[in-house]
UniProtKB/Swiss-Prot annotation:
Keywords: Ribonucleoprotein, Ribosomal protein, RNA-binding, rRNA-binding
Presence of keyword Nucleotidyltransferase: no
Family according to the record: Belongs to the universal ribosomal protein uS5 family.
Designated name of the protein: Small ribosomal subunit protein uS5
NCBIfam families recorded: rpsE_bact (TIGR01021)
Phylogenetic classification of the source organism: Bacteria, Pseudomonadati, Campylobacterota, Epsilonproteobacteria, Campylobacterales
Residues of the S5 DRBM domain: 9-72
Record organism: Campylobacter jejuni subsp. jejuni serotype O:2 (strain ATCC 700819 / NCTC 11168)
Free-text note regarding domains: The N-terminal domain interacts with the head of the 30S subunit; the C-terminal domain interacts with the body and contacts protein S4. The interaction surface between S4 and S5 is involved in control of translational fidelity.
GO cellular component, one term: small ribosomal subunit
Length: 147
């Protein structure tokens, strides 16, 4: 297992959710957090954490993200080729863009490609816009890239 210097990485919280368990005495709340970490130099990871308090869920998600770091192969400031990936009901399409285009991405796709260090890319999210599935589809697409 590789060890990364956490100071180099930035964290972005994509989603915080509240889940409820109804018990005899009322409702019990727990929180979930979806976090992306990246160093803007080709390393990016996604993590999911659950806890009774929001800060604990975020901390667990960050720890999980560092366990799931992947390397993204780039070609200059963009990606080498088109890639389309399906993850559950979410589909994501990534296309290389010419220099100066910028990151054209929406929702939870944008922080992933930015933290991966990609500066010029066109993306389209198709199907379900469930943030957890869109994030996982984007990570899957980035791992399929050939340098």
């Amino acid at each position: 297992m590789e060890k990364y210097n956490r100071e180099e990485f930035e964290e972005v919280i994509v989603d915080i959710g509240r889940v409820t368990k109804v018990v005899k005495g009322g409702r019990r709340f727990r929180f979930t957090a979806l976090v992306i970490v990246g160093n803007r130099k080709g390393l990016v990871g996604v993590g999911y954490g659950k806890a009774k308090e929001v800060p604990d869920a975020i901390r667990k998600a960050v720890d999980d993200a560092f366990k799931n770091i992947v390397e993204v192969k780039t070609k200059g400031s963009t990606i080498a080729h088109d890639v389309e990936v399906k993850y559950n009901a979410s589909r994501i399409l990534l296309k290389p863009a010419s220099e100066g285009t910028g990151v054209i991405a929406g929702g939870s796709t944008r922080p992933i490609v930015e933290l991966a260090g990609i500066k010029d890319i066109l993306t389209k999210s198709l199907g379900s816009n469930n943030s957890a599935n869109v994030v996982r589809a984007t990570i899957k697409a980035l791992t399929m890239l050939k340098g």
